[in-house]
Regions:
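Short amphipathic alpha-helical segments with coiled-coil-like heptad repeat character
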Residues: 2-4, 88-89
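Bacterial N-terminal signal peptides that target proteins for export
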Residues: 3-17
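General helical secondary-structure elements
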Residues: 7-8, 25, 112, 257
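Bacterial N-terminal signal peptides
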Residues: 16-25
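Boundary at the C-terminal end of the N-terminal hydrophobic targeting segment
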Residues: 31-35
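Extracellular (secreted or membrane-anchored) zinc-dependent metallopeptidases
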Residues: 36-276
């Protein structure tokens, strides 16, 4: 049987933790004002995206529901900070959290199987869009990615749907990293070249074909959210962002902020066309 977190208490906790995180991150941003330069964002229509999370009930053997809720609130706030810093007209909001005993940690190894099994076990359908056509990203949350059949990855994103998985003990940037993949963003060159013989080989094998500018970046020994660096800046790669005077991207190869903006614009056009 599936259990739901009390909606009112969850929302209050999300608001509280979110406010605290925003204050902390804002102060951090101000303290680094001389070393990190963010662009001035132009006003535009905003795409509001929803996130539905399905939590392995065995998580509660290690963590309380309050702790899990605080982690989810942190992920949400981090995502919105990344989008804001990168001038991407989009928001994230976790609107549904479902605890279920149906999830098995072995699912972490095969996201496609996890998605199919979860859809079969849930009483309600798993949505990919809201009633007005806005995107819904669905994620399976595990307790520990190390114990999930010794997974090499802290999070995984589907190549064919808006489905992802991650663990409670993953870095706070992981959720936005995976949703970035679901929106068309790719890793930095260093990570891509560990798994492919060349960037051209990766692009040729991707479907839909990855734009040449869809890669993450490193700058001044730090990485953007799609990189695998230990020190992550809460931004998508963009030539408009600088760290210690060094650009965190370029127009030709490392501009995931553009990728996300194009995703937002495409979705908004679909939503608006359905209204007419």
């Amino acid at each position: 049987m599936n259990t739901r977190v009390s909606e009112s208490s969850f929302k209050r906790l999300i608001q509280l933790v979110g406010c605290v995180l925003i204050i902390v991150l804002s102060n951090s941003r101000l303290s680094n004002a001389q070393s990190i330069e963010f662009p001035t964002c132009a006003k535009s229509e905003v795409l509001n995206t929803e996130i539905h999370l399905y939590v392995d009930e065995s998580v509660l053997a290690e963590y309380s529901k309050a702790f899990v809720a605080s982690k989810i609130a942190t992920w949400e706030s981090y995502s919105n900070l990344v989008l804001k810093n990168s001038c991407i007209p989009m928001t994230r909001k976790v609107t549904k959290v479902t605890y279920t005993p149906e999830i098995d940690s072995l699912w972490f190894q095969d996201l496609g199987a996890a998605e199919r099994l979860l859809k079969l076990s849930m009483e309600e359908p798993i949505k990919e869009i809201t009633e007005d056509g806005s995107p819904v990203f669905s994620g399976v949350v595990f307790s520990n990615y190390h114990s999930a059949f010794e997974s090499r990855y802290c999070g995984v994103a589907s190549q064919v749907s808006r489905f992802f998985s991650l663990a409670i003990n993953c870095p706070d940037s992981t959720m936005e990293h995976e949703i970035g993949h679901l929106s068309g963003a790719n890793h930095d060159y260093k990570k891509v070249l560990k798994d492919h013989e060349s960037i051209d080989h990766f692009i040729a094998g991707s479907y839909p074909k990855a734009p040449a500018y869809s890669f993450g970046a490193t700058c001044s020994e730090r990485g953007t959210v799609m990189s695998y660096e230990r020190d992550i800046i809460p931004v998508y790669s963009s030539p408009e962002i600088r760290v210690n005077g060094q650009q965190c991207g370029d127009n030709a190869h490392h501009n995931n902020a553009r990728v996300l903006r194009e995703f937002a614009n495409t979705q908004l056009k679909l939503i608006n066309s359905n209204k007419n």
